[in-house]
């Protein structure tokens, strides 16, 4: 799954963050899951949005779902 997300030009960590964003998690929750501070997660999200050329988390999540069908199995 991460390989499909990193093929979008994201780092492995950004791919992890995007997978959690696509599952509907907020920065605080993602930080707890990944052992990072919410501000760090916020910066990762900013980089993700910039690299994907989208304006919000919802658009980034839509790209993640379109690129990685395994995310659908998580619901």
Q: Where in this protein do the model-derived segments appear?
A:
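Helix-turn-helix DNA-binding segment
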Residues: 1-40
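Basic, Lys/Arg-enriched C-terminal extension of HTH/homeodomain DNA-binding domains
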Residues: 4, 50-75
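Hydrophobic residues on short alpha-helical segments
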Residues: 18-22, 49, 61
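Small/flexible residues
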Residues: 41-42, 59
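Residues within the DNA-recognition helix of helix-turn-helix
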Residues: 44-47
């Amino acid at each position: 799954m991460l390989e499909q997300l990193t093929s979008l030009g994201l780092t492995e960590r950004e791919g992890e963050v995007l997978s959690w964003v696509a599952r509907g998690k907020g920065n605080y929750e993602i930080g707890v899951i990944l052992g990072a501070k919410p501000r760090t997660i916020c910066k990762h999200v900013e980089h993700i949005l910039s690299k994907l050329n989208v304006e919000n988390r919802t658009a980034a999540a839509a790209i993640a779902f379109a690129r990685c069908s395994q995310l659908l199995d998580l619901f």
